[in-house]
A protein has these predicted regions:
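Short hydrophobic beta-strand element within catalytic cores of glycosyltransferases
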Residues: 300, 309-312
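Nucleotide-sugar donor phosphate/pyrophosphate-binding loop at the beta->alpha transition
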Residues: 92-93, 129, 138-161
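Conserved acidic donor-binding segment of nucleotide-sugar-dependent glycosyltransferases
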Residues: 323-334, 341-344
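Carbohydrate-associated surface elements
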Residues: 171, 191
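A conserved mid-protein helix/loop that constitutes part of the nucleotide-sugar donor-binding site
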Residues: 26-31, 206, 215-231, 253
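Glycosyltransferase donor-sugar binding loop
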Residues: 45-51, 192, 211, 239-253
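Aromatic "clamp/platform" in nucleotide-sugar-dependent glycosyltransferases that forms part
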Residues: 292
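Nucleotide-activated donor-binding/catalytic signature segment of Leloir-type glycosyltransferases, i.e.
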Residues: 244, 252-274
Length: 371
């Protein structure tokens, strides 16, 4: 065991996922399970079936599907039908989770992200230590509030129901420390898995890459506008590929129209789908993260492990991952233009990460065994 080799019995952890499919927060959960399996026995609650089921089966992690509503939506008080569905479903989910905790007797109960809440209630009822893992700002990055819009009440409940809250960046921990001063909040930088592959073709497809879901908060428009400005000012035009899934057809249409309207088709390429990061990233030189409120920015770590430098907006938790060896920060459009056009140079030293993953794993191990 990492820090507890003298312990003969591993602690049992029951972990509530916020959704049934693999997403950023669920991927973080899986990565923690992978690195902590020698220290803890895990089981997981899924709110519905999805791709997480296969990932857990592969790891031989027991899981339970308990259907439930989160508390990240807002409804009018007169929507009696909706409120009744939430009440009945939540009561059933809390009851099922209560029985599961009584039967499986976990030593610690986790809630992953701000979205679910029912497991925190069941943990409180059974007097089990509860840890809330926060991976997002909420309103700033995904546009939602918790507690069905009554956030002050939600913050009070999170403090009362939790022995520990973990933020995945100092920016996250800082925000929620101000909102929840009566509970212990710690920052843990997550381990990021990476399977290094041999690159067959050394020729790069483009200089810059934006990788991940196409949503407005990721800042694609700002980058395309900066390339447009490079063209208008007669500066060197960079090549940019935007790769990732898209569920917002209107936003995708706006991006394509922006490219075509400014005749940037030879410089900006947008491709929709799910891509293998280990295969795709090495085909580029620099990853761009232009999000206005990125909580952690795991894609930055992935890019660095792939050998890419990064160009990152100085906002949210992302700047915490940048140092003089691995990338460049930009504060405004002029600085973005300078980096895209080559006027601002990137580091030419060996890339190093801003934190030691092994030390972070040891830290979380010690925190959990102290509960």
């Amino acid at each position: 065991m990492l820090a507890n080799s003298n312990k003969l019995v591993k602690k049992k952890i029951l972990w509530q996922a916020h959704e049934g499919n693999i997403s950023g927060a669920n991927l973080a959960m899986l990565e923690y399970i992978d690195v902590l399996q020698n220290e803890f026995d895990f089981s997981v609650i899924l709110p519905h079936e999805g791709s997480m089921k296969q990932a857990l089966v592969k790891r031989k992690i027991p899981f339970f599907v308990i259907r439930q509503y989160g508390w990240a939506n807002k409804y009018h008080w007169w929507a009696f039908g909706k409120w009744m569905k939430i009440l009945l479903r939540s009561f059933k989910a809390i009851t099922q989770t209560f029985r599961l905790i009584k039967k499986s007797a976990p030593d610690i109960v986790f809630t992953n992200t701000l979205v679910p809440f029912t497991t925190s209630v069941a943990a409180k009822m059974t007097r089990r230590p509860h840890v809330w893992w926060i991976h997002e700002f909420g309103k700033e990055d995904f546009g939602f509030t918790i507690g069905w819009g009554n956030e002050k009440w939600a913050w009070k409940w999170m403090q009362v129901s939790s022995q520990l809250i973990i933020g995945n960046s100092r920016a996250i921990s800082s925000k929620f420390s101000n909102l929840m001063p009566k509970v212990k909040i710690e920052t843990i930088y997550q381990p990021v898995s990476w399977q290094k592959r041999e690159t067959k073709d050394s020729v790069k497809k483009a200089r810059f890459l934006m990788f991940g879901q196409l949503i407005e908060s990721k800042g694609h428009k700002d980058v395309i506008e900066a390339i447009k400005a490079c063209k208008e000012m007669g500066k060197k035009l960079p090549t940019l590929h935007i790769l990732g899934p898209s569920e917002n057809s209107e936003y995708l249409k706006e991006l394509n129209e922006l490219v075509h309207k400014n005749k940037l088709q030879n410089y900006v390429h947008i491709e929709i789908g799910y891509f293998n990061k280990e295969e795709v990233m090495p085909q580029y030189e620099v990853l761009i993260v232009a999000s206005k409120s990125e909580a952690f920015g795991r894609v930055i770590i992935e890019a660095n492990k792939a050998g890419l430098h990064v160009l990152v907006r100085n906002s949210g938790g992302s700047p915490e991952l940048i140092n003089a060896s691995n990338g460049v920060l930009f504060n405004n459009q002029n600085e973005l233009i300078a980096a895209l056009s080559g006027e601002k140079l990137f580091p030419d030293s060996t890339i190093r990460m801003n934190y030691n993953e092994s030390l972070e794993v040891e830290k979380i191990n010690e925190l959990l065994y102290s509960l």
